[in-house]
Amino acid sequence: MKFEKIHNKGQAQLFRHPALEMLTKAHPLVIWGMYLPVIIGLPLYAAMNLHLTALRLTAFFIIGMLFWTLFEYLMHRFAFHYIAESKRAQKFIYIMHGNHHHYPRDKERLFMPPLPSLILAILIFGLQFLLLGNNSFAFFPGFVLGYLMYGSMHYAIHAWNPPFKWMKPLWRNHHLHHYKDEERGFGVSSTIWDQVFGTMFDLKKEKEDKAKVQELMFEKKKIS
């Protein structure tokens, strides 16, 4: 997936019908509002009704969060950057991720929209329940919190400079993924798997192109 030009204004039109187009957008707070009850409610249900211990709940919750980072990496690398031959597959990949490379300043498409997000969440929870049984009531909330942290980190990378020095590699890794090489730097919430699988940028050698980085940042509202 290669895009020769970054569009700095507006957003991609994914569907002709305005109702469908609206369903492709999401505000971060809406997504957090949808999933916070799940993150809190499922472990409470498991503790009160399934008699899972606090230690077990905590362990599977943390494992779920950590598993998200691997899931994020694999999806980004092998699904969202898959070189498809069919037009339908190309369109699907563009809807899922390609439009973000084309319009990196689009704030409304950094999180998956509510409806497809809920459908996918139900399917993922069902699969995790089949594999993990009642442990999924802790694993899935951890997995979802990992997703919310990923989405929020992605938003922050395009909105602000890194607030702490130790976070700068995350920012630079993602910026370089956009403007230098789309086949590296797949981790957004973590660079661990880029380092494990050899797709990490050498940040000591790569010079930061401030002009290109600025093209990736959300436009700041001008105060009149």
Region spans (language model):
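Non-catalytic, topology-defining segments of multipass membrane proteins
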Residues: M1-F140, S152, E182-S224
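Residue-level detector of transmembrane insertion/anchoring sites
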Residues: I62, L66, V144, K165-K168
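Short, membrane-exposed interhelical loops at transmembrane-helix boundaries
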Residues: L170-L176
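Interfacial helix-loop-helix junctions of multi-pass membrane proteins
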Residues: I157-L170
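Alpha-helical membrane-embedded segments
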Residues: V144-G151
